[in-house]
Every structure is written in C-alpha cells, then in structure tokens.
Amino acid sequence: MKTYSAKPSEIEKKWWVIDAKNIVLGRLASRVANMLRGKHKPSFTPHLDCGDNIIIINAGHVKLTGKKANPKDGKIYYRYTGFPGGIKDTTAGKILSGKHPERVIKMAVKRMITRNALGAKQMSNLYVYANGDHPHMAQQPTVYDFASQNPKNKK
C-alpha cells in the first residue's frame, strides 16, 4: 500500500470560531496549533498548508494557571530592540490587561508552529480578537466548543 500524499487542489479548508473566555491558554494554543497545521485531518501532509482557518474571540478573557498571571513575577516575555542593553521584558498579566491582549494567544500558538515559510503561511490563517466581535461572518464559521471537550480546558 502506498503512502497517501495530498495535492494542493485536494485540500479543503474549513473556518472555525473558538470562544476563549475562561479557557486555559496552553491547552487552547496546542489545539489551535494542531488545527492550523492540519494534523486533525486524515489527509494531513507535512509539506503542505492543509490546516483550517481559526478565529479566536474573547482573547482578553483567557486564563493562565499557577503564578503565570501574576503581574509582578509571572510569565515573562522578552524582546530585544537591537541596541546594546536594549532587552525589554513584560509579563503575561500586563499584556492581558493592556491594549492588545490577543498577542498572548498569538505568541503561544506561534511558538508551537514550525519556524519556516510554511509556518508563517499557517499563522496567517489565525485570526485573534480581544472581544466577542469578528468580521468573518461571510465565511460562515463553525463553532468549535473547546471548553466541553475536557473539564481541564476551562478554569
């Protein structure tokens, strides 16, 4: 029996909408990363973008477990300005309470996707919004009930 390898013309992409309200960040990010890669499909092909389009709403209400949400000594995100001594840091709690809370989910998912051109293409299929509104109603997304799959998914 030959190994099946999908062709780009055979790939069908679905649109999913996930409500992240009171959902644990790491569990959500790992599931979304698998869906963006297409690993939940039987026609998964590693070298093609066979994943689905994911819309995440209420990203500002995602939950962090343990001490990660603590603004003083919680999970720290680093960035570098490019100048000597220019390393900057901020905590996950500050980002979630700040102007762009959707960046926490985007960073978590991005770090679970392969770091190459295919990963960048797959990340372009992720749409994260801080509140409950999204402009993708024309695509008729299917609601993905992530919270009811496992009691540990919700906090």
UniProtKB/Swiss-Prot annotation:
Domain of life: Bacteria
GO molecular function: mRNA binding; structural constituent of ribosome
Any one Gene Ontology cellular component term annotated for this protein: cytosolic large ribosomal subunit
GO BP term (any one): translation
Pfam families referenced in this protein's UniProt entry, alphabetically: Ribosomal_L13
Similarity comment: family membership: Belongs to the universal ribosomal protein uL13 family.
Physiological role: This protein is one of the early assembly proteins of the 50S ribosomal subunit, although it is not seen to bind rRNA by itself. It is important during the early stages of 50S assembly.
Assembly and oligomerization: Part of the 50S ribosomal subunit.
Protein name: Large ribosomal subunit protein uL13
Source species of the chain: Rickettsia africae (strain ESF-5)
